[in-house]
């Protein structure tokens, strides 16, 4: 591994490409003091403004949305636990973080928070929109990341 890459952020959205990104990093020889933070971003369920819907029904919808968020967070944590385990078995100090928000913004925030020097992403993620060669988050990260970006297919 290049001497400059000791703190890596991996976007781990559970997609096949992101799982390959985790495997790719796991196969690298960890440098002394090297660490990996796997980041899973959950986009919160946003309810539209519903002024004409009765308050009781709005409250029920909000409760259901919160339950969906909790369920998605639990699934994300299980996926992260698997990624962290694979990295730890390969000798990396690794941890997983679930963040809520927009994927690119949260990955960039994680880079800053972890003082990362490399971002590793799968070429395409779990999003509904498919790009021809590169997913929207990977494409935007290549343009906006303050650190090097490694895209794994």
Question: Could you tell me what each predicted segment is?
Answer:
Residues 37, 95, 150:
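Conserved beta-strand positions in the Rossmann-like core of class I SAM-dependent methyltransferases
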Residues 59-71:
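Short glycine/proline- and acidic residue-enriched helix-loop micro-motifs
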């Amino acid at each position: 591994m290049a001497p400059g890459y000791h703190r890596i952020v991996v976007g781990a959205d559970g997609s096949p490409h992101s799982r390959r990104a985790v495997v790719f990093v796991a196969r690298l020889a960890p440098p002394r003091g090297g660490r990996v933070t796997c980041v899973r971003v959950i986009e919160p369920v946003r309810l539209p403004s519903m002024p004409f819907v009765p308050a009781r029904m709005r409250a029920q919808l909000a409760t259901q949305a919160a339950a969906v968020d909790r369920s998605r967070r639990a699934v994300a944590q299980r996926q992260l636990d698997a990624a962290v385990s694979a990295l730890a078995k390969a000798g990396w100090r690794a941890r997983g973080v679930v963040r809520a928000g927009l994927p690119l913004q949260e990955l960039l925030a994680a880079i800053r928070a972890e003082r990362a020097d490399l971002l590793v992403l799968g070429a395409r993620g779990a999003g509904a929109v498919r790009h021809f060669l590169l997913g929207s988050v990977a494409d935007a990260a290549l343009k906006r990341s303050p650190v090097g970006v490694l895209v794994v297919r």
